[in-house]
C-alpha cells in the first residue's frame, strides 16, 4: 500500500524483501531480494534510498537499527521496537494517559493461573511478539482449557486481554516529517472480521 501511494505521488520506490509473493513488486522502481537479517544486502539497500519505512512492524529490530545508522528510518527503530511487543505498546499507552482493557503478561504457568482468575467472562490470549492481524491469538473464556490454548501458541510469552464489546473502532493517524512538521490524517473507521482488518473508511462518519 505504501509503495502504491508513493508511486502515485511521484516518488521512486526501492523495495527490500525476501523472495516470494510480494504485491509491491508490481509498482516498485527497484527491488532487492534478501532476508531481513542479511546485513550486507541491507547496507547496499540503504545506500540507494533517502528514506526507509516498513509495510508492517515485525522486521528484526537489529536490522532497523542498522538501517537507521545508514539512512533515515521512519518511524524510528525505537517506535518499531515498541510496536513489536504488545506489552510495551500497552505500557506506553497507559503512560500516555490512555485506557486499555484489563490485561496480564504471561511468562509462565503461574502467571497464567493468576490471570485466569481476573478475567470476567471472555478474553483473548495473544503472543507478546510476532502477532499480526488476527495471527498469534486465540479467544478464550472461563470454560476454555487455558493451558492447551497457551501450548497452541507455542508456550511463548503472551498477554491475556479481557475481551470488550466494541460498537465502533476509529483510528487517528499522526505524522511527523523529517523537518519536524507535525499533523494528523483524517479520522478513519475500521471494520474487522474474526480479528482481521477488512476495510478502513476515511473520513469516518461520526
Each model region followed by its residue ranges:
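Short glycine-rich anion-binding loops that position phosphate/pyrophosphate groups of nucleotides
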Residues: 57-59, 129-130, 175
Amino acid at each position: 500500500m505504501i509503495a502504491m501511494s508513493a508511486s502515485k505521488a511521484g516518488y521512486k520506490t526501492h523495495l527490500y524483501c525476501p523472495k516470494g509473493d510480494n504485491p509491491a513488486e508490481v509498482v516498485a522502481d527497484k527491488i532487492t531480494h534478501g532476508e531481513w537479517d542479511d546485513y550486507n544486502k541491507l547496507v547496499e539497500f540503504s545506500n540507494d534510498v533517502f528514506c526507509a519505512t516498513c509495510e508492517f512492524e515485525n522486521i528484526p529490530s537489529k536490522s532497523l537499527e542498522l538501517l537507521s545508522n545508514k539512512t533515515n528510518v521512519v518511524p524510528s527503530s525505537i517506535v518499531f521496537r515498541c510496536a513489536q511487543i504488545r506489552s510495551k505498546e500497552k505500557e506506553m499507552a497507559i503512560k500516555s494517559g490512555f485506557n486499555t482493557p484489563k490485561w496480564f503478561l504471561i511468562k509462565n504457568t503461574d502467571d497464567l493461573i493468576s490471570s485466569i482468575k481476573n478475567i470476567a467472562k471472555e478474553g483473548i490470549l495473544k503472543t507478546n511478539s510476532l502477532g499480526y492481524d488476527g495471527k498469534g491469538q486465540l479467544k478464550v473464556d472461563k470454560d476454555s482449557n487455558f493451558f492447551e490454548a497457551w501450548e497452541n501458541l507455542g508456550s511463548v510469552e503472551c498477554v491475556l486481554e479481557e475481551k470488550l464489546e466494541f460498537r465502533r473502532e476509529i483510528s487517528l493517524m499522526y505524522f511527523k516529517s523529517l523537518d519536524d512538521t507535525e499533523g494528523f490524517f483524517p479520522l478513519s473507521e475500521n471494520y474487522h472480521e474474526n480479528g482481521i482488518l477488512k476495510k478502513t473508511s476515511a473520513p469516518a462518519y461520526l
